[in-house]
Regions:
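Bacterial N-terminal signal peptides
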Residues: 11-21
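Active-site beta->alpha N-cap acidic-glycine motif
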Residues: 24-105, 114, 129-147
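His/Asp/Glu-enriched short active-site or ligand-binding loop at hydrolase and phosphoryl-transfer sites
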Residues: 155, 160-191
Length: 191
């Protein structure tokens, strides 16, 4: 998607989320805007568009590699995150390494990393993976994450959901209009 196309779509969604956009009596539902860190290509555009429309969003943060060659939770992004905090947005975990929870087996969960390697995580390791962005975000902004998390790729397992809940994080999935290849993949539980 081109930057121009992305900007137009983002502006439309942000406009719908503003107080003026939802003040219509016929519209009784709430629209929640959420963004995952990704490669941060559109980070500034997202921030500008949200500010222009006075819209708030929830950002799910992971320490992902950015187009600049650093990571989204490196100190080089501190000013960006501090500004979003000052604007009143909400923040949740998108896991530290942005891996994919693949399958539960006995008391372990298979976790595939971005480089293709697979690890097995117990409940404590699952919690550590979800909590680690909170520690870094606090270092960068002085603010803790909200007790929310979103599984990378929308992939959860029964064990990851249970472990995350036990360590205080509520899972927030994607809407059916997310960017997954098929509707069936949305919040798919593997295992």
């Amino acid at each position: 998607m081109s930057a121009g196309s992305f900007a137009r779509r983002l502006a439309l969604v942000a406009a719908m989320a503003t107080a003026a956009g939802i003040a219509n009596a016929a519209c009784s539902a709430t629209l929640y805007l959420t963004f995952d860190t990704g490669n941060m290509r559109h980070a500034e555009l997202i921030a500008e568009t949200l500010a222009k429309h006075r819209a708030r969003a929830t950002f799910f943060v992971a320490n992902e590699k950015t187009l600049r060659g650093d990571n989204a939770l490196d100190p080089t992004w501190a000013a960006y995150w501090q500004a979003r905090v000052a604007e009143g947005h909400a923040f949740g975990s998108h896991t530290w390494r942005h891996g994919s929870f693949r399958q539960d087996q006995d008391k372990l969960t298979h976790y595939r990393l971005m480089d293709g390697k697979t690890e097995t995580l117990d409940d404590d390791a699952i919690c550590a993976e979800i909590r680690r962005p909170d520690s870094r975000f606090k270092e960068l902004t002085g603010r803790a994450l909200d007790p929310l998390w979103r599984a990378p790729g929308g992939r959860t397992t029964p064990r990851t959901l249970k472990a995350a809940q036990a360590c205080g994080f509520h899972h927030v999935g994607w809407a059916a209009a997310g960017f997954l290849r098929t509707h069936a993949e949305c919040n798919g539980r593997i295992g």
